[in-house]
């Protein structure tokens, strides 16, 4: 529905695609395809990834930019047709060497009081958000002097 609104109502360009040919999905799932695309980069530092992927940025969203380039996407991967249809929300996480997460992640706000008053968990607003949603957590672990490794 979002794609229809963006394309025909708002006149926005088409969403970028990760999978260039539908034939790819005959052999593997979308999730397996994503893992196959990014596993070649496991163990690389942010600087190595920036060099290899041609990224010249130190933006706060650097990890998201690196992930998009790993998947051959220009722009946000959350806006790709495949991620939208699959209901997958990508989240990049930086974990410090002491095991603590560097930044907090944003999630929709919800009312704890209202949640506690729901008859069942399945009727809650939070459940209706979490149940159909998949999260793709991409971890960058700090190793050494501020170097984050994928």
Describe the role of every protein-language-model region.
Residues 1-150:
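Nucleic-acid endonuclease domains
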């Amino acid at each position: 529905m979002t794609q229809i609104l963006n394309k025909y109502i708002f006149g926005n360009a088409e969403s970028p695609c990760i999978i260039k040919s539908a034939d790819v999905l005959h052999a593997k799932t979308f999730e397996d395809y994503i893992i196959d695309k990014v596993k070649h980069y496991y163990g690389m530092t942010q600087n190595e990834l920036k060099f290899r992927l041609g990224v010249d940025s130190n933006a706060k969203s650097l990890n998201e930019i690196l992930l998009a380039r790993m998947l051959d996407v220009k722009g946000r991967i959350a806006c790709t047709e495949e991620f939208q249809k699959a209901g997958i929300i990508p989240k990049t996480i930086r974990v410090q060497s002491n095991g603590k997460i560097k930044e907090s992640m944003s999630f929709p706000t919800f009312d704890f009081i209202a949640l506690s008053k729901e008859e069942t968990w399945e009727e809650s607003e939070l459940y209706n958000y979490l149940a159909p949603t998949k999260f793709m957590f991409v971890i960058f672990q700090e190793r050494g002097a501020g170097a984050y490794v994928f």
